UniProtKB/Swiss-Prot annotation:
Name of the protein: Fluoride-specific ion channel FluC 1
GO molecular function term, any single one: metal ion binding
Keyword Repeat belongs to the record: no
Taxonomic path: Archaea, Methanobacteriati, Methanobacteriota, Stenosarchaea group, Methanomicrobia
TM stretches of this protein: 1-21, 37-57, 64-84, 98-118
Protein's membrane topology: Multi-pass membrane protein
Reactions it catalyzes: fluoride(in) = fluoride(out)
Amino acid sequence: MLPAANIGDLFLIGTGGFIGASLRYTISSRMPKIRSIPAGTLTVNFLGSIVLSLLTFSSEPESVVYLVNIGILGSFTTFSTFAYETFKLLEDGQNVSFFLNIFLNVILCLLGVGIAYFALRL
């Protein structure tokens, strides 16, 4: 477990949060929906799963964990947006897209973790 954060750690987390949120907006705003599925959220969650796993499995120093894992990737990936967009699909009566979005997010993010895990074992 990581120790309590000091001001330097909080600065790294905040800086990373700014970078991650900016990247998420940039990617998500340029991705079209595919069959009503919010591809931007799916893309950032998939990419974030890969990068987070690569860093976690390779035991990076705490400063990298604060900046990248917690800061950048914490604001880059987004479970709350995924939940809202998925619920909106259900509310709009797009039942197939609702289930497909859940399936794709879970499977692709797990696949991303697996890719990172096995890539570091090569």
